[in-house]
Amino acid sequence: MKDLNEIRAEIDSVDKELVSLYEKRMALTEQVADYKLSTGKKVFDKAREEEKLEKVTSMVDDPFLKRGTRELFEHLMSMSRKRQYQKLAEKGIMEPIPFEEAAALPDKNIRIVYQGEEGAYSQMAMQQFFHDTTNSYHVQTWRDAMEAIAKGEADYAVLPIENSSAGIVSENYDLLVEYDNCIVGEQIIPIDHCLLGTKGSKLSDIEQVYSHPQALMQCGRYLDEHRNWEKHSFKNTAMAAKKVKEDGLLRQAAIASRLTADIYRLDILDEHIQDNSNNCTKFVIVTGRKIFLKNAGKISICFEIPHESGSLYHMLSHFIFNDLNMNKIESRPLGERNWEYRFFIDFEGNLNESAVKNALHGIKEEAENFKILGNY
């Protein structure tokens, strides 16, 4: 049996050859890139890559080595594509990103729309983000808010996108895909839920509770302590409070903010009833113009990928290769295709940065229905 050091020396020798061959292969890759640049061919040629993978794996008999050979060449070809994307950027041939840099968000004579009624958490987020909210109004649904932007009836819309306890607001993720609107900002506000009843009502009177589904989820433990209460979903916490006020029934209560108690003159029957004392909701500010600020530091994108082994891994490799920090990944089912998903990713960066351009170009070439949701 050979000594361990002797075996390691042989491995080092083989590794040296591998590195030399890798450098030679990448040099040939650059020639391929030059050819594709001159002919206008796309960098990613899925059929050619699959043909190549079938060929190299057929050279190996051992099942374990066959799988390893495929992974090795998948990675080699991935590195080859990334180098080609770099060359495109260096020569200024890369397709421009359809976003315009702005020194500041337009904030004069702006119209802002939010979903709900006066006192809604969306209204609070709007008031914290914008200096002037005198020309603001509310609509019934989040879709109505996005539609107002699309029709030019509003300049900005405020939408909840995620709660720290209940998770994402899935409907609004879908609306960001459906509408050609753009995220230009975000606002995080603390959520402090109260149980509100009509004047003179007591906790012992309550039989029915109204609120938004997310608010009901966020107060799950509290509601479990009152299992005899009927829970009813409403489009908005402030709408629920308004209903309780208008109905004027002692048996009804709403889960909403302290502000809505003041607005609709309701009694606070209990307070701080959310499960998480640090409960927060993130809202996004959406507009119809594809703009981003010079100091914007977060990018949101979405895309679809084939339902194949390793397809998500290959998309994420663009962030690793370009040294970009990914903050979040979510998936949403594609309604028309069972068990297939659209992925949403947030990562740090600015659309002016070359690393960001390289990563986005690669993902756009290799994924389906790629979309930049905003840089903010």
Where would I find each of the regions flagged by the language model?
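Domain-level signature for soluble enzymes in the chorismate/prephenate branch of the shikimate pathway
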Residues: 1-376
